[in-house]
Each structure stands twice: as C-alpha cells, then as structure tokens.
Amino acid sequence: MAWKMMDGYEMVIGLEVHVELKTKTKIFCACPTTFGAAPNTQCCPVCMGFPGTLPVLNRQVVHYAVLAGLATGCTIARYSKQDRKNYFYPDLPKAYQISQYDLPLCVGGHLTVETEAGEKRIGITRIHIEEDAGKLVHDPEKGTLIDCNRCGVPLIEIVSEPDIRTPQEAVAYLHKLKAVIEYTGVSDCRMQEGSLRCDVNLSIHKKDEPFGTRTEMKNLNSFTSVQRAIEEEYRRQVEAIKKGEAIVQETRRFDQTTGKTSSMRRKENANDYRYFPDPDLAPIVLSDEVIAGWRKELPQLPDVRKAAYMADYGLTAYAAEQLVSSKYLADYFETAAQSTTAVKMLANLMISEVFRLLDGEDAKIPLNPAALAKIADMTEQSLISVGTAKKTIDALWNTPEDPEEYVTRMGLMQISDEAVLAEYVCKAIDTHPEMVAGYRKGKLTLKNALMGVAMGLSGGKANPVVLQKLMDAALDA
C-alpha cells in the first residue's frame, strides 16, 4: 500500500548509511575481516584498545572511501583528519570510536533517483571513514554476550541531505546507493551480513512551517524494514502531535515483528561525544595526482549503463533502470545479450521471470546466460510462446539442459503452420455457430471466445498472431 500524507504533515528524512569496506584486514591493525568467524577470534590488542598499542591506518580504506566519493559526485578533501568519538557501550572496548568529525574525506555529492514524479536529486552531505564496533549477542540462557570480531572493521558512513520526502524516495535512494557502491567494488553490500546498514532520521512539519524535532531509527538492515519503519514513525509522530504531545529527540528501535518503534535512549548531540583529533594518527593528505589516479579506476556506473541500454538496445527507461539496479544483474544481462539479437525480449524475460525467481536481494542466477538468450531467441522467432518461455525458464532454472532440446522433448514448440491452424479455426467456427452469429450481429467480444476454443484445440500451442489473422479472415468472409 502506498504511503499517504496525514492531515497535511510532510515528512523530512535524512539517511545515514554505514557500508563495510571489502578490505582483507581491519582499518588500524592486521586482523582479518572474514565474516562468520568464531566469536572473538579476529581481534588483537590494537582493535581492543589495550594500553600501549598504536593504530596504523590501512591505506586501502582511504582508497575505497575516495572511490565511493568520486562515484557519488563528492569533492575529495586534500586534507582530512581522524577524531575520537567518546562514549561508553559494552561493544566498544576502547570506550571511543575512531571516526571523522569536522574534516571528512568526501563532501558535497549527490545521487539522482527515479520517483513516481520523475527524477529527483538527493544530496550527499559527506562520506567519512570510521571503525565498526563489536556485536552484542543476546542468549536467553547465558545473557548478553560480546563478540569483538567486528571491532575495527572499516566502514564508510554516507550521510544524505534531508532531501527525502517519502518512504518510496528513501528506498529508491538506498537501491541507487547500493548499486553505485557495488559497481565500484569497494563493498559487497550484503545487508543480511550487516555490511550495509541504515539509520533513518525523521521529522514532520506542515508546509511553510519550520522542521520538527527529529528522531533516529538505527541499524535497519533491509529496504523493507526502512520503508516500514519510516511509515510507522511518521504515523506515530502525527498522532502524538495531534494529541498535544511533544516529539522528543531520541533514538528509537524498530521491531520487525510488531511493526512498531519504541524508545531506546535520548538522542545525543555532537558535544556529548567530546570529539577531539586522535593524537595517534597523522592527518590524511592526498595529492591531486593520487586522486586523479584513483578516478581512472572508476568503472562504468549505473547511470552510464542505463543510458547505453536505452541507446543501444532501445530499452525503456524503466527496463534499463531495473537491469542496472545491481552490477551482477547488469553483467549477467550483457553476457546474455552477446548471444542473441532479441535483446528486448531478453530484457523482458529477465525483468518478468528471472527477477521473480530470485530468492533475496543478493541471490545469484543459476540459469546460464546463453540458455536465457536462446529462450529469448526462440520466443522472438515465434518458435515458442511467451507463456512457454516462462515455463521453460522455471523448468531449467537449476538444470543445464539445452532449452531447445527441452522444448522439443516436452512438445512445447509453437504451431505457426497456417494450414494446420486453419483447421482449428474452421472446427471452432463449425462447432459454435451461435457465437459466429452473435459476432456478426455486433457482439465483437465473441471473437475472443472463438479464439479460446481454437487455442484449446491446439493444446495451447497455436501462434496467437497467426491464429488471430486466420480467425479474422474466417469471420469476416
């Protein structure tokens, strides 16, 4: 169900997206970043903050952060620094997080997203590097346990401008951002593994009035959760204001089971974290030559591929947008397109059928690209119907059988022989004279009924275009 404005209250949304970088080691030490390792087996005195240890910045983290900044149109700072963000929480052994406060690495970017009203430009305030905290594991028998493997895993935090006005725009922005980051190769963006997490800042106000007090919902790990959390928090704030209650600046938790948000703690301000430059880390200084060299590494990004698909293959903006929504899907499409001239049909089958069969945002396609290309060719050449193409994709999804051999073996080839189809048309007309008479008296919908009879006589294998032509000729004779 689409979101609807309540009582004239507009929402104002800003997103903070945390992306785990795909480095082999952590941001300030040599510990590995492998996902799923046994608890507390990938940490050392440096990432645990033991006295006397010194951090050493991983150059690859800066490299990847700059690539993300360049891909989102940011200005790259020639001089930036790292700061300590001080707070106490069980998953933060050092009692401070190394982040960036007033001099981030990247500033002033944007993404353009497709909305129901057309294209919309959403600003990106900044991208900065920081280290991740550990993870609390809640066990009903043992209580809350702490896994420090994630401490020191490198992150970039991508902070949007408060330009988003609907849940749908928020999800569109996240889809676009995820695609851009995947294309650069700096992260796998696997939300189910926590390598892309989203915090939502939301306030409401009436048009031409000042923005309201914002609340924050943290660590949302799916696009569906983001949309549901926004819709629910908007509803809660509107109802609270209508009751005369004040909106408190706080952090709230979204419960996926109940679909409700609940208060976690009062929201801190920057001063509460007592930021100061980390005395153990030198400033990050980048030359124009280094940045120019990294810029050359940028791959072809989604918007460029989208424009190419529209120009080269004649695809619609919608179809092209769907295909470039993931680098994996775009690569698969391009590989399949090399084996067929029926590229539009290929795109249609991917969007309507392949996407339907994918299990989750990060699922892979087991069907060989060349096999899908052959199915597109057979459909374009009217050897099989679109319905048969869909059945064939379903049947061969996890098997290596050749599509043409499968269709032949199952007797699914479409009948286009006019002599054969003419017999079905004649039989349909001869056995239903009342429909023919009704059609000729002006009940034109009866032609569709006769088409259905003839199609049934063919076992559903008749080429509908040829069958339609023959039926028209017979009825108008």
Predicted regions and their residues:
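Extended, non-catalytic structural segments that build the interaction scaffolds
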Residues: 290-297, 304, 334-339, 372-384
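Short amphipathic alpha-helical segments and their helix-coil junctions
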Residues: 325-340, 354-358, 369-375, 428-438
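A carboxyl-terminal module marker
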Residues: 425, 465, 469-477
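Basic, nucleic-acid-interacting segments
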Residues: 2-300, 311, 317, 338-342
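Strongly charged, low-complexity linkers/loops
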Residues: 363-373, 377, 383-457
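Core structural elements
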Residues: 193-206, 310-334, 343-360, 396-399, ...
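Residue-level detector of well-ordered alpha-helical segments, enriched
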Residues: 319, 332, 342-350, 371, ...
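Short, basic interhelical loop/turn and adjoining N-cap
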Residues: 457-464
